[in-house]
């Protein structure tokens, strides 16, 4: 039985342009005065480079906390990018999706977690690594609603 990848298409909604303040924020809030507005920023245009090849998926677990990816984070994944060593990728391992850092050591390719409590995933002869895409961004929510 051949498995077909599950598709997670980018959201097909019109961009919403929000104000981008030029004032840098250390521990306060910028004045809402128009003098500080640098321009307008659309998050989908900022986060998505290739609309037709981008999908979203939620992170599960804490194997990537060292890379700033936490349980429940929304990952922006571009499947048009060719993964290179050091990229964070979505891969299929033994039929399950995982997010890990793709690494190359000599001729060996492996997936590295960013949490010392987890082991590297090494591939033996005959095992296939299927990369679904490169993680380009994360979206974090601090207030659940």
Give each language-model segment a name.
Residues 76-77, 90:
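Hydrophobic beta-strand signal
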Residues 66-67, 75:
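Charged, well-structured alpha/beta interaction segments
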Residues 31-32, 109-114:
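Short, solvent-exposed secondary-structure boundary/capping segments
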Residues 1-65, 97, 119, 126, ...:
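Short, positionally conserved secondary-structure boundary motifs
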Residues 72-73, 87:
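Structural motif
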Residues 85-99, 103-109:
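Short, compositionally biased
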């Amino acid at each position: 039985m051949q498995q077909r990848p599950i598709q997670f298409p980018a959201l097909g909604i019109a961009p919403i342009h929000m104000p981008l303040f030029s004032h840098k924020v250390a521990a306060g809030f910028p004045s809402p005065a128009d003098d500080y507005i640098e321009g307008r920023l659309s998050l989908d245009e900022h986060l998505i480079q290739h609309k037709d090849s981008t999908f979203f998926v939620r992170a599960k677990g804490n194997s990537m906390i060292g890379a700033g990816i936490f349980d429940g984070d929304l990952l922006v994944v571009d499947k048009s990018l060719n993964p290179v060593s050091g990229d964070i990728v979505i891969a299929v391992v033994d039929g399950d999706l995982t997010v890990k850092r793709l690494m190359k050591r000599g001729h060996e390719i492996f997936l590295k977690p960013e949490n010392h409590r987890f082991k590297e995933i090494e591939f033996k002869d005959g095992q296939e690594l299927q990369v679904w895409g490169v993680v380009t961004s994360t979206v974090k929510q601090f207030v659940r609603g």
